[in-house]
């Protein structure tokens, strides 16, 4: 084992020999990060990425100034999906150390799960991993039900069944109930709904290779809300929350769904399929119907839903949609507290009517006449939320995954959004 490289913090500028804006310097004792008070967490994260790029795989965070947030910023930049890294953490008080350990356990689970190859992580495996994580932090306060394959069709989950039937791996619905009260009649405070498409080829509306090569990550919404519930539990969540994960592959086969098919949902809505690559909203609809039936105060769905959100925001922000201004403000306040990037995009009543079909009540995709793809996708989902004007948040997870490394992130999953949703649940 190589000796650890010491990483220390300083509020003094680097020696002029390192350059006017140097963020780190190297000396006989190790590496010093020079904080300027403007964006210290970002500076630490970017420096960690550079340190990893130097091939330094064993570090010791040493000296004064380290807390849970700064340690976590370092780890966010240092962690990468390939190779191993070791960090010797500084002395923290018990509360700070527990917070850091919980982030390392849960958000690393989210990142590693999203990064897993689709061959290893099918719908059933994703559902079981979610159960295992929540059970690990909640113990006997959790019950769950897994419904799969033809049982989904028999029970009316037609969106999930239709999308997933083209794969040899059966589609799965996970319904998990975290009930710390022990009272089976306790009201449900919140429902979390996640898109769990474990691989998305686009179906017969097939993706080009350049857009398909990262589609193992199309279950990022499911991983994010699972991590958020687990993290909220570690922060003392004392209200009943239900989790619905809609898990499937979207593949091509003789049994796969086709353009022009019409799906009839349990709430009576009929949807014409005009793009099999707009499948995420079709599976989420089933989860949102179940969530609405619980009559919760709060419904949050999360999905890697549209390329339009990425076009608007890149991979730097999650896109937020809601008709409920006060609730959207609460989510954005939680994001600010957790130093996670969210940006609200438009969602208006007219977006709900921008999905016309000649053969059904709704089309599953907008047309050239209505190009606001992320907003019309949110508008589509609103048709499956009973009281869509209050208590509902839709997160289009554009910041979940990066195909290529940047100055603060390695390639792969980021884990962003977990802490924000957990913060909102425990506020």
UniProtKB/Swiss-Prot annotation:
Cofactor note as given: Binds 2 manganese ions per subunit.
A Pfam cross-reference name: DUF3663
E.C. designation(s): 3.4.11.23
Binding site for Mn(2+) 2: 195, 200, 218, 279
Cofactor(s) listed: Mn(2+)
SUPFAM superfamilies: Zn-dependent exopeptidases
Catalytic site positions: 207, 281
Listed GO CC annotations: cytoplasm
Location, primary (coarse class): cytoplasm
Binding site for Mn(2+) 1: 200, 277, 279
A biological-process GO annotation: proteolysis
Localization terms from the record: Cytoplasm
Reaction equation(s) it catalyzes: Release of an N-terminal amino acid, Xaa, from a peptide or arylamide. Xaa is preferably Glu or Asp but may be other amino acids, including Leu, Met, His, Cys and Gln
Alphabetized GO MF terms: manganese ion binding; metalloaminopeptidase activity
Record flagged with keyword Cell cycle: no
Keywords, in A-Z order: Aminopeptidase, Cytoplasm, Hydrolase, Manganese, Metal-binding, Protease
Subunit structure: Homohexamer.
PANTHER family reported for this sequence: LEUCINE AMINOPEPTIDASE-RELATED, PEPTIDASE B
UniProt similarity note: Belongs to the peptidase M17 family.
Function: Probably plays an important role in intracellular peptide degradation.
UniProt xrefs under NCBIfam families: PRK05015.1
Protein name: Peptidase B
Organism name: Escherichia coli (strain SMS-3-5 / SECEC)
């Amino acid at each position: 084992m190589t000796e650890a490289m010491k990483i220390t913090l300083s509020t003094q500028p680097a020696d002029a020999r390192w350059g006017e804006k140097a963020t780190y310097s190297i000396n006989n004792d190790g590496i010093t990060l020079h904080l300027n008070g403007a964006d210290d967490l970002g500076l630490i994260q970017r420096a960690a990425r550079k340190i990893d790029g130097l091939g330094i795989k064993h570090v010791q965070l040493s000296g004064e100034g380290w807390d849970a947030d700064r340690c976590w910023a370092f780890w966010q930049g240092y962690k990468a999906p390939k190779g191993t890294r070791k960090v010797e953490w500084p002395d923290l008080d018990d509360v700070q150390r527990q917070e850091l350990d919980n982030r390392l356990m849960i958000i690393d689970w989210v990142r590693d799960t999203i990064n897993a190859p689709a061959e290893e992580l099918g719908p059933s495996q994703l559902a079981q991993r979610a159960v295992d994580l929540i059970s690990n932090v909640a113990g006997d306060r959790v019950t769950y039900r897994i419904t799969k394959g033809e049982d989904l069709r028999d029970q009316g989950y037609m969106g999930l069944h239709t999308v997933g039937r083209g794969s040899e791996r059966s589609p799965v619905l996970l319904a998990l109930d975290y009930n710390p009260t022990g009272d089976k009649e306790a009201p449900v405070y919140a429902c979390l709904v996640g898109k769990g498409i474990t691989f998305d080829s686009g179906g017969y509306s097939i993706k080009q290779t350049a857009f398909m090569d990262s589609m193992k990550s199309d279950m990022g919404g499911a991983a994010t809300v699972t991590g958020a519930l687990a993290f909220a539990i570690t922060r003392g969540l004392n209200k009943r929350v239900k989790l619905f994960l809609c898990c499937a592959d979207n593949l091509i086969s003789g049994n796969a769904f086709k353009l022009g098919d019409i799906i009839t949902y349990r709430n009576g809505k009929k949807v014409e399929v005009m793009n099999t690559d707009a499948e995420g909203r079709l599976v989420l609809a089933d989860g949102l119907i179940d969530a609405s039936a619980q009559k919760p105060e709060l419904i949050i769905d999360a999905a890697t839903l549209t390329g339009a959100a990425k076009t608007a925001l890149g991979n730097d922000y999650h896109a937020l949609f809601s008709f409920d201004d006060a609730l959207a403000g609460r989510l954005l306040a939680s994001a600010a507290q957790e130093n996670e990037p969210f940006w609200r995009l438009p969602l208006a009543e007219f977006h709900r009517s921008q999905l016309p079909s000649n053969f059904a009540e709704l089309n599953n995709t907008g047309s050239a006449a209505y190009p606001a793809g992320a907003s019309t996708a949110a508008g589509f989902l609103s048709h499956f939320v009973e009281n869509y004007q209050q208590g509902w948040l839709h997160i289009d997870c554009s910041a979940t995954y990066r195909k290529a490394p940047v100055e603060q992130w390695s390639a792969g999953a980021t884990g962003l959004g977990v802490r924000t949703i957990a913060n909102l649940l425990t506020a």
